[in-house]
Curated annotation (Swiss-Prot):
Sorted UniProt keywords: Carbohydrate metabolism, Glycosidase, Hydrolase, Manganese, Metal-binding, NAD
Binding site for substrate: R96, N150, R287
UniProt keyword Hydrolase present: yes
Name of this protein: 6-phospho-alpha-glucosidase 2
Catalytic function, reaction form: alpha-maltose 6'-phosphate + H2O = D-glucose 6-phosphate + D-glucose
Lineage: superkingdom: Bacteria
Co-factor binding details: Binds 1 divalent metal ion per subunit. Mn(2+). Binds 1 NAD(+) per subunit.
Pfam families: Glyco_hydro_4, Glyco_hydro_4C
A GO molecular function held by the record: oxidoreductase activity, acting on the CH-OH group of donors, NAD or NADP as acceptor
Binding, Mn(2+): C172, H202
Length: 461
């Protein structure tokens, strides 16, 4: 792609609460990533229309030359596009609430991307992401799909196996947000940092944080996190500021205590301290409810205000600067900039002592041909054991989706560190199946019915 090219993009998940902020961010970056066309695509026509009508007013005022459309038709959406930015939520907030509340009913971690909730979400998401890939390959085969839909690791593993030749890069905003906090702790800008990191999505550790001159800041940040977690004096992003997120950032000090050598991803709390998480969760009011009562209402009321007024003078959407990593990634591909970014890629030796076919999150150099992971060497036994366990959970989930196999999904839940036993795993699974009948493939049981030892039977032995 030449330096003077203008790009056509489609945002899959056009009705998302993040869409408007991302569009504003694209306008902010128009000099380095100019747009000729912007499309929104969603299967929820009514939800998307509210966001799209408000964006149309913003674009008419700020960038009238951009050809803007929104649609529920795949051919219209995916024809003549250079990039697809994908942030879909399969099942919407209605099912996110079930992902969180069903496990909590069983006194198990209820979270949208980790544990049984993440597995349920993954089972809904695989087919939808594969469908997007197929639309792209049919209507715009040269298009790159930049996917930041959750649960990213399960989705990435499914894409590796089901669409191995797809032009897709999987990226997550969580490390970006944490690195913003790190930069604030040491008084630098996020772009000043050059990090080393290994793990899986929502499941990893920073082993080095340097500036461009090669000065190492890991010890300084580590000392800060040991006392304060990742809480900072000044909030550095808008995505992770709610009360539940503040508690998560604070909990990082306890994650660091488990291994004080490396800086942990905050999501590790769900695996290392699941009992704490459950004890501090409200089974009747979860993160899904917090988002619906906060961000959801705020974004849609702002959109309706713009629509009713017919102008953004009443209050423009804020720029989601936190999402600038998406433009960084698109520019790296479009202009072969060899940007260094954390991406979810097939291991292939990047982490020396885990399997090559595990989808890892590591620093990569990104250019026109995609991502080249940087080698991280061998990792310690503790982290290796954690990663291998979680990788097998996610592989079993994908197996279960492909094979429509109840047994494999039960095994995946049983293997997860967030569940205490096979019995609890089965009870949670059966409730999740009931809630997800509209979304999951129908799972086949083994011909032999499963009988578990009941509490009463144990007491009689």
């Amino acid at each position: 792609m030449n330096q003077n090219k203008q790009f056509s993009i489609v945002i899959a998940g056009g009705g998302s609460t993040y869409t408007a902020g991302i569009v504003m961010m694209l306008l902010e970056n128009a000099e380095r990533f100019p747009l000729r066309a912007l499309k929104l695509y969603d299967i929820d026509e009514e939800r998307q229309a509210t966001i799209a009508e408000a964006i149309a007013i913003e674009l008419k005022e700020k960038a009238p030359a951009i050809d803007f459309t929104w649609t529920t038709d795949p051919q219209t959406a995916f024809t003549d596009v250079d990039f697809c930015f994908a942030h879909i939520r399969s099942g919407g907030y209605k099912m996110r609430e079930q992902d969180e509340k069903i496990p909590l009913k069983h006194h198990v971690v209820g979270q949208e991307t980790c544990g049984p909730g993440g597995i349920a979400y993954g089972m809904r998401s695989i087919g939808d992401i594969i469908e997007l890939i197929d639309f792209i390959e049919k209507y715009s085969p040269d298009c790159w799909m930049l996917n930041y839909s959750n649960p990213a690791s399960i989705v990435a593993e499914a894409c590796r196996r089901l669409r191995p030749d797809a032009k897709i890069l999987n990226i997550c905003d969580m490390p970006v947000g944490t690195q913003r906090r790190m930069s604030q702790i040491i008084g630098l800008q996020p772009k000043d940092l050059e990090v080393r990191y290994f793990g899986m999505n929502h499941f990893g550790w920073w082993t080095s944080v340097k500036d461009k001159a090669g000065n190492e800041y890991l010890p300084q940040i580590r000392d800060y996190v040991a006392h304060h977690g990742y809480l900072t004096q000044i909030e550095v992003d808008t995505q992770h500021m709610d009360a539940s997120w503040q508690a998560t950032h604070k909990k990082a000090q306890d994650l660091l205590a488990v291994d004080p050598h490396y800086l942990p991803n905050t999501y590790l709390k769900y695996y290392l301290y699941p009992d704490y998480v459950v004890a501090h969760s409200d089974p009747d009011y979860t993160r899904a409810n917090e988002v619906e009562d906060g961000r959801e209402k705020c974004v849609f009321s702002a959109a309706q205000k713009i629509i009713d007024a017919g102008t953004s003078d009443v209050g423009s959407f804020p720029i989601d600067s936190h999402a600038s990593f998406i433009v960084d990634l698109a520019c790296a591909i479009a202009f072969n900039t060899h940007e260094r970014m954390l991406l979810i890629v097939e291991n292939n030796g990047a982490v020396a002592n885990i399997d090559d076919n595990i989808m890892v999150e590591v620093p990569c150099i990104v250019g026109k041909d995609g991502a080249e992971p940087l080698t991280q060497g061998k990792i310690p036994m503790f982290q290796r054991g954690m990663i291998l366990n979680q990788a097998m959970v996610e592989k079993l989930v994908v197996d279960a989706w492909i094979n429509h196999d109840y047994q494999e999904l039960w095994q995946a839940l049983t293997l997860s560190k967030t569940l205490p036993s096979a019995q609890v795993a089965k009870e949670v699974l059966d409730d999740l199946i009931e809630a997800n009948r509209e979304y999951w493939p129908e799972l086949k049981h083994d011909e032999h019915e499963v009988h578990l030892i009941s509490e009463s039977a144990v007491s009689e032995i």
